[in-house]
Amino acid sequence: MLSMSPIIHSLLDTDLYKFTMLQVVLHQFPQTHSVYHFRCRNLDETQYPLTDILDDLNEQLDHLCTLKFKDDELQYLRSFRFIKSDFVDYLELFQLKRRFITAGIDEEGRLDIWVEGPMVQAMMFEIFVLAIVNELYFRRIRSDAVLEEGERRLQAKLALLEQYQTQHQSDEPPFLVSDFGTRRRYSFEWQKHVIAAFHHHFPNIFRGTSNVLLAKELNITPIGTMAHEFLQAFQALDVRLRDFQKAALETWVQEYRGDLGIALTDVVGMDAFLRDFDLYFAKLFDGLRHDSGDPYEWGDKAYAHYRKLKIDTKTKMLTFSDGLNLEKAWELHQYFKGRFKVSFGIGTNLTNDMGQTPLNIVLKLVECNGQSVAKISDSPGKTMTDNDTFLAYLRQVFQIAEEEPVA
């Protein structure tokens, strides 16, 4: 019995790309075993130790593992042309297993969460766990003053969008913003409040949300394709390490046949990605997603690559999703609007801009089929692995320089 209200009420309360990736895993490599590990990147900025929420977290995880998909939720998923009927049949039977996740305290006294089990189970924990940790943490420091400040900041964002809408020329590519903030949200209710306000006031700017439940409830478009874990898994599957990105992209193409065509570029950095992103993939994929490194430099590299392949960049989409706010998004739109279609996924700044320091938390894939996997980000400090030896080998294979140590 929960001692407080449940945070997750529905298995749809997660990001769309969890479903799109899970479908490929189920169809292409269902026996894959995986390990995920939790990390808070800004422990020194928390108002109290995250370990204080451990008992409540375990209660919430117990509850999460009782949930199943409801009939109307399955019908909603069935309505998307890229979701196959056999996948919905699988989801009808789906239930997260409590034995695959453990939450405790590590040797250094930090909150320690591990997920270990079949990837078709394990990958679905991530967004739920991060949302639960966030909401438990902020529940303890919630006040009317915090909510009032959050509302003030929301109204300022709406006023800024009004200004941008006035400045936008009708013959320019649209300024498109989506909510990518489920994993770092203040609470479910706050995320819904923010999304509803954006959708109501700016339906031509607000493109949708990554959150499938909120997309269903508010009748807006769910947004998402793939995350790092999908590409990383191929580092441990039956392909040469040097070929893992090409294998992942090819598998995606075979599954979706032209749908969900935005490729993520920073699993081993943009330069290494572009070496694999040949004419075949450049024509097949609708565009690219930026999630680390200098966005201007990244977009210019994408532009030069498409030009070299003699592809009209105005037919391609650049999606930016790294630490954005509306001001940064508008500046990027102004810079790239003459060359690309552009869109922006804004996370923490939309769903947890309350005047308190947000948690910078992740639950990342670190092992697949008993073998380490890694991400070598374009941003120092976002690289993640539990195996420095494998990380060094990955750098060598993809000719990536060692990054400066981050304190």
Swiss-Prot record:
Any one biological process term the GO annotation gives: NAD biosynthetic process via the salvage pathway
Catalysed reaction, written as an equation: nicotinate + 5-phospho-alpha-D-ribose 1-diphosphate + ATP + H2O = nicotinate beta-D-ribonucleotide + ADP + phosphate + diphosphate
CDD domains: PncB_like (cd01401)
Spans through the membrane: none
Entry's EC annotation: 6.3.4.21
GO cellular component: cytosol
Recorded superkingdom: Bacteria
Metabolic or biological pathway: Cofactor biosynthesis; NAD(+) biosynthesis; nicotinate D-ribonucleotide from nicotinate: step 1/1
Modified residues (Phosphohistidine): 228
Phosphoprotein recorded as keyword: yes
Post-translational events: Transiently phosphorylated on a His residue during the reaction cycle. Phosphorylation strongly increases the affinity for substrates and increases the rate of nicotinate D-ribonucleotide production. Dephosphorylation regenerates the low-affinity form of the enzyme, leading to product release.
Inhibition and activation profile: 100-fold more active in the presence of saturating ATP.
Enzyme class: ligase
Disruption phenotype: The nadB-pncB double mutant loses the ability to grow on minimal medium supplemented by 0.1 mm nicotinate, but it can grow normally in the presence of 0.1 mm nicotinamide.
GO MF term (any one): nicotinate phosphoribosyltransferase activity
Coiled-coil residues: none
Keywords from the UniProt entry: Ligase, Phosphoprotein, Pyridine nucleotide biosynthesis
Family assignment from sequence similarity: Belongs to the NAPRTase family.
Function: Catalyzes the synthesis of beta-nicotinate D-ribonucleotide from nicotinate and 5-phospho-D-ribose 1-phosphate at the expense of ATP. Functions in the deamidating salvage pathway for production of NAD from nicotinamide. Displays a strict preference for nicotinate over nicotinamide substrate.
Protein name: Nicotinate phosphoribosyltransferase
Source organism of this protein record: Acinetobacter baylyi (strain ATCC 33305 / BD413 / ADP1)
